[in-house]
Amino acid sequence: MSETILTAENLKFRYDSEQPGYALNGVSMQVRRGEFVAVLGANGCGKSTLAKHFNAILLPEEGNVYVEGMDTAEDDKLYDIRQTVGMVFQSPDNQIVATVVEEDVAFALENLGVPPEEMRRRVDDAMKMAGIYEFRERAPHNLSGGQKQRVAIAGVVAMRPDCLILDEATAMLDPRGREQVMQTIHHLNKDLGITVVSITHYMEEAAQADRVLVMSQGNVVMEGTPKEVFSQTEKVRSLRLDVPQAAELRDELVKAGIPMPEGIIDTGECAQALYELLK
């Protein structure tokens, strides 16, 4: 089994072939099996367009996209690709189709003709993994935004994908809802080994990833660990992005003459550094 699960090679795509500008302009990147990768970028940079290529919702105009070595342009690979890569979108209401939580989680499995006993097991497992088992008999419209998004995640997880693509899946949630969803995502990644690619504009979420890609004007312009990327605060800001609050605080303290170590990106590190200075 290949260590690389997702690959883009010189990927070019535009929504209107009669217009000169490309939404993706020569993207080359890889995602390794089991990684948690965050993809950042200002609005219109191409990050959601890239995400849709990994599930073959969109196909390259030029270049190639491979999912576990399968070319997304090959029609006979489409079923296997979508079994391998599941997607969760921004609005959970657009993905929920049933009137009872457990029926919604089972929806795709029913369409695939999965035997009832296996379906029951997979649905229960997925709801427990997503932390919504207690809501299984409730109507989705009575749940909070974060709970609905976890229902959508459970529906994808029940398909047993190797990779989960989150296309701004926390964008419409309040802070508590975002926290609930991210706890679920980290559990799926760290405990179950599911590869995660998260398209996000929340820097604190990206700071928890294994690796960060920053996109601008249809290409990847920065790549590295969260520390490597967010330590370059001026470059990140020049791309019309924020930095994690802890990194911003660290910069302000340095400007005020307080010696702070490089690479601080979370509040715990910042608090520890200040504690060491005050001892």
Indicate residue ranges for each PLM-predicted region.
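Conserved ABC ATPase signature
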Residues: A139-L143, Q147
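The feature captures the beta-strand-to-loop junction immediately N-terminal to the Walker
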Residues: L40-A42
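Conserved ABC ATPase "signature" region
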Residues: E117-F135
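Catalytic Walker B motif of ABC-type/P-loop ATPase nucleotide-binding domains
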Residues: L164-D167
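Conserved ABC transporter NBD signature motif
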Residues: G63-A73, I81
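Helix-to-loop junction immediately C-terminal to a conserved catalytic motif
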Residues: N55
